[in-house]
Amino acid sequence: MSREYLEDAMQEISDEYLEEAIEWKPAEARVIAKRQKTRKDETFGKAHARKGVRIWRVAVALVTAAALIATAVFGIGGFRFGRRSSVLKAFAINEAEYPKASPYPDPAKFGFLDSKENQEAFSEAFAPWRAEQKNRWSQASAIGDGLDGFWQQSISAFLKGAREENRVYSPVNVYMALAMLAEITDGDSRQQVIDLLGVKSVEELREQATAVWTANYMNDGVNTSILGSSLWLRNDMEYKKPVLETLANTYYASSYRGEMGSEKMNQAFQTWLNEQTGGLLEDYVEGETLSEETILALASTIYYQAKWTNEFFDKKNETGVFHSPAGDVQCEFMYEYMDLGGTYYWGEKFGAVEKRLDNSHSMWFILPDEGVSVDELLQEAEVMDFFTADRWENQKAMNIHFYLPKFDVSSKMDLREGLKTLGVTDVFDGSLADFSTVTDLKGMCLSKANHAARVTVDEEGVTAVAYTVMEVDGARPSQEEEIEFRLDRPFLFAIMGTGDVPLFVGVVNQP
């Protein structure tokens, strides 16, 4: 189906929605508006896009035009949850019920808006979805700048030192795990965590975590972004109910109970991790087990899938050389000529380009200058400021020859040393750790903090998953120009979600 046909259909949607489209997705809406205006003067009216949005925030919601194209061309389906295996049900105390998302209406079911009757029916079906997007963005505004410090500090702490390896980190996934850790601790143990997360109290943390979760939850048949949480308990211990209820109500945490260290309990634990990450981290999950000494364990996950607003065409792919730290390697590069709305950003030691996703999110690619390593760049305050700046001064509209290697990168890391450098220390020391909100048992400590993540990029879009496992044991030790932006040497990437939340960041040394 041609883009022009879809644009004609767009023209028939109510002025209210079209004006809102300009507000939510200004670049794409203006292009369509300009084309429509040459055929009909009464198109988009005089609505204007907001100015001064943060460079990481591309739009408030998925505009109708983008979703029309995504649904009609890609036939995207949402990630399906709720089908728990019998292995899990045998251990379940409480299983979280995710909010039911209103589906984005398929324009094909409404004759692609070819009549007034179909237009009205589409608008009626569209209204609940639209209301949910507004709610997501109202939650996003509640996040504010309080998390900027955590995003910056943790990205630097967990990505540096990759050397020749790829490294992938999901800040939002680790954030949710740390927020739950704060809930099960007290005293200085809790204070160190909430200080890192940029809040003054656990009550403020709950409001912040709710905003982050709600703003970045999507499962409407077009967009998929699912944050999952779970709590794993012993069957021979009693735990304090208030904190268990808080974890269930605020973090959508499912609770499971059984014999720690048993084969069946570990099978259930691994099943939950695999189900929540679509089976894309099975090799890492295989190594995640709960020991006989485990008092409790927390797990958080994210499953994310999005299509490019403008997909790559595989016929334009070419084989080229990627200059890996381990030596030159041949890889397949995708190509796009960004001749409409392309913007090049730069700093003293890097250049950056944004590629938009069809869910109001973006993926950014940060390329160190020649002679500058990724590790060196991660030590620079400027690149960290770039992640969270309201507006970046060094930018220019350009026609960009964009070359991106197809990649599937993953990593698993131990977060403990990184968390200690970030100021979270007491939970690792059995003589200092305070877990009194969940149990009166003394001498416990955080013995495990593992994080695994994977990001796959191809012609159609992005799929990304991550999990974090934390285990508590008994105490033991302006002018249009052209530029070529060829990502043919190690680079950084970032997938930014609703409300400037970094969903995934990573280092690609070996595409």
Say what each PLM segment does.
Residues M1-R50:
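Disordered, charged N-terminal biogenesis/targeting segments of membrane/secreted proteins
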Residues M10, A27, R57-F81, M470:
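Single-pass transmembrane signal-anchor helices and their membrane-water interface zones
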Residues A70-S86, I93, G443, H451-R454, ...:
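Non-catalytic interaction/Regulatory regions outside core domains
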Residues F79-V193, R476-E480, V507-V508:
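Flexible propeptides and autoinhibitory/regulatory segments associated with cysteine proteases
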Residues R83-S85, V383-A389:
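Soluble, non-membrane globular domain cores that form compact, hydrophobic packing
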Residues L88-D114, N135, E164-V174, L181, ...:
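Non-catalytic, conformational "gating/processing" segments within enzyme and secreted inhibitor domains
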Residues Q192-D195, M237:
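Mid-length scaffold segments of soluble, non-membrane domains
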Residues L298, G351-I366, S478-P511:
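Extended hydrophobic
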